Each structure stands twice: as C-alpha cells, then as structure tokens.
C-alpha cells in the first residue's frame, strides 16, 4: 500500500484564514480544569469546553468556515448536507448567518429536538431512511434541483481547517502541553487537531 505524505506547512495559511472567519461567527470557548480530576490522575488536565460553542458542539467551527469562505455566487445557491444532529444544526445556523438557504438531510431516527433545532434556524429538513445510501441519494437529488453546495460533515478541507482552530486556541492559551486527547467519529476534529498540533506545538502528542 502506498502512503501519501501531508505537507503540514501548506495548511498554516488555511488554518489562519479559518480562524479569522471563526472569530467573527463562533466562540473562543473556555478552557477549564478540575482540581478533583487532577488529584485522581496525578497531572494537570484541561478541558476545551466546546459544549459552550454555538449549537453546543465543535461542529460549528467547520461549518461556518465552509460556508463563510465561499464567494457571493456560491452562497446564493445555498448549502446542503446530511447529518443526524450537530453538523446539521451548524450548517443551518451558518447558512442563516450568510442569509442563504440550507437544505438538511436527516435520518428519520434523528432526535426530534435536533430536527426542531435545525428547523428553528430556518433550514429546510428532508427526512430519509436510516442509512448512508439514502442520505447520499437525497442530497444528490437536492443538489440537482437547487444547485446548492454540498458540505460533507467531515471529509471536507474547509471543515477540517475549521475544526483545527479548536486546538489552535488551546495552544494560544496554554504552554507546554504534553498530550491532547481527541475524540474520533468521522475524523474531522481529529484531523484538524493533528494539523494544528504539527503547526503550533509539534512536541505535543495527540491521542
């Protein structure tokens, strides 16, 4: 198997650009720690509290960067994505900020509170079957009908660079971080965290 190499330095300008956008539209969330947890684990542990982010999740960073970095013509076409919750809300709110349409494909089994939140941001919600093929097919149909721009929940460079700003803010506030522990779902946050770590704190280990 051939493994490609990533030119991390080529991402510096992209991450800086993403952060300039995100500063205008999302929160620099607080970094907190707990003396109780520190005593249990025997080291200093800090939490980057993205639960205080707009829509309550880090997904806002990637979505707002993907939307706001588009040109006027692209924005006018609107945006489409598929998601069961947080990315759906993030694209919906980002599209509202951009004063354009959002077409959000969500599985029928998605929590009603998240479906209602997406609708509350003014997006059009399309319910589909609870499988990947149905999500993709529904998005493709919307794109053909509207010409809207598709924003993948994690397999999108602008989304990844947006998520990278979370770790960037950590390195701007804290010194000499030994380890960052990052959750992995689709991999957008993990990819962004690795990029920022290589750029701003290469001695830090990402787990």
Spans of features found by a protein language model:
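PLP-dependent amino-acid enzyme catalytic core
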Residues: 1-207
């Amino acid at each position: 198997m051939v493994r490609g190499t990533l030119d991390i330095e080529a991402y510096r300008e992209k991450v800086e650009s993403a952060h300039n956008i995100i500063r205008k539209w999302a929160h620099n969330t607080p970094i907190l720690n707990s003396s109780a947890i520190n005593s249990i684990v025997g080291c200093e542990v800090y939490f980057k509290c993205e639960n205080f982010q707009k829509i309550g999740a880090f997904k806002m960073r990637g979505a707002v960067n993907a939307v706001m970095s588009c040109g006027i013509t692209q924005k006018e076409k609107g945006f489409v994505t598929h998601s069961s919750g947080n990315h759906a809300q993030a694209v919906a709110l980002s599209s509202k900020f951009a004063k354009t349409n959002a077409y959000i494909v969500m599985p029928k089994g998605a929590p009603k509170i998240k479906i209602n939140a997406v609708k509350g941001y003014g997006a059009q919600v399309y319910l589909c079957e609870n499988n990947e093929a149905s999500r993709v097919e529904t998005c493709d149909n919307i794109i053909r009908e509207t010409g809207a721009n598709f924003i993948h929940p994690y397999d999108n460079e602008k989304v990844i660079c947006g998520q990278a700003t979370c770790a960037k803010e950590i390195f701007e506030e804290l010194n000499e971080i030994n380890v960052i522990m990052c959750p992995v779902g689709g991999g957008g946050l993990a990819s962004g965290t690795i990029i920022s770590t290589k750029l701003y704190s290469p001695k830090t280990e990402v787990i």
